[in-house]
Regions:
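A hydrophobic, multi-pass inner-membrane permease signature
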Residues: 2-279
């Protein structure tokens, strides 16, 4: 009787998750099909009526779309590296239990998660530091993320202190302990937090809207919105319709992480146990 109940429960779960999966996959599949369809036709189709790559050629051969794409790639790469660097160094400092004032620093950081400066004061500070209309402004601001720093700290705290103390007795510097011991044991945290940074930078729209007024510095999300709204359509390659170009742009916007995610998935499973003992 118990086995029968378990089987029924499993079947119900499978049905529910299958429905959820279809709800998420079907819209993406529709956009993908329409991005290759050179014939202007609306509605759901299993395959393109007139297959072609003209929509993607319109994106990558037009400077008004290619430049924002490259800017997004640059800011995502630089921002992710800087964000991870800040999180790793900050987390490593906060796990040094002998350091005086460690608890005070941690509490100050946590305080900023609850009470921030607000939009207007932040804008004024950015302006005073000449970081408006500057790509470094939209790179540096999200890089300082206390939430990610705390996650990294929790993971580091799961590494046995005895390992680091043994390395210190053997004459290792803090940099060597971090590089040789802590980071190799933290691949799951680095992958998980790194992807969170990367997704945030790639999808960043708000910071560009607030701090960037020079259209030459817009990222792909800013151009994508203008394209979808129909206010900034690029000159289409012969054979590409307006609908084809719009759908191709959407696919370009989501494709990088659809490719990256399967390779990082195993680290997310490990990342569920952030803070677990690794001894």
């Amino acid at each position: 009787m118990m086995k029968k109940k378990v089987k029924i429960f499993d079947i119900v779960l499978i049905v529910i998750f299958t429905v959820f999966s279809l709800v998420m996959i079907i819209p993406v599949y529709k956009v993908l099909v329409d991005s290759f369809d050179l014939k202007t036709a609306y509605g759901m189709k299993l395959f393109p009526e007139q297959f072609g790559f003209a929509g993607y050629k319109s994106i990558f051969t037009n400077p008004t779309m290619l430049r924002p794409f490259l800017i997004s790639c640059y800011t995502t790469a630089m921002g992710t590296i800087m964000g991870l660097l800040i999180s790793v160094l900050g987390a490593y400092v906060l796990i040094q239990w002998k350091m005086p004032g460690r608890a005070f620093i941690a509490n100050v950081l946590l305080f900023t998660m609850i009470f921030n400066g607000g939009m207007i004061p932040t804008y004024l500070v950015m302006k005073d530091f000449h970081l408006t209309n500057n790509l470094w402004g939209v790179i540096l601001l999200p890089a300082i993320n206390v939430y990610n720093l705390v996650l990294m700290k929790n993971f580091f705290e799961g590494i046995p202190v005895s390992l680091m103390e043994s390395a210190e007795i053997d004459g290792c510097s803090h940099f060597k302990i971090l590089y040789k011991i802590v980071l190799p044991l933290s691949k799951a945290a680095l992958a998980s937090i790194g992807l969170m940074y990367a997704v945030g930078y790639w999808n960043d729209y708000t910071n560009y809207k607030l701090y960037i007024t020079n259209s030459n510095l817009y990222n792909f999300q800013m151009k994508l919105r203008a394209l979808i709204m129909g206010s900034d359509l690029p000159s289409a390659v012969e054979g590409a319709t307006e609908n084809t170009v719009k759908n191709a742009a959407v696919i370009v916007a989501i494709l990088p992480f659809m490719i990256i995610y399967p390779f990082c998935q195993k680290y997310f499973v490990q990342g569920v146990n952030i803070g677990a003992v690794k001894e």
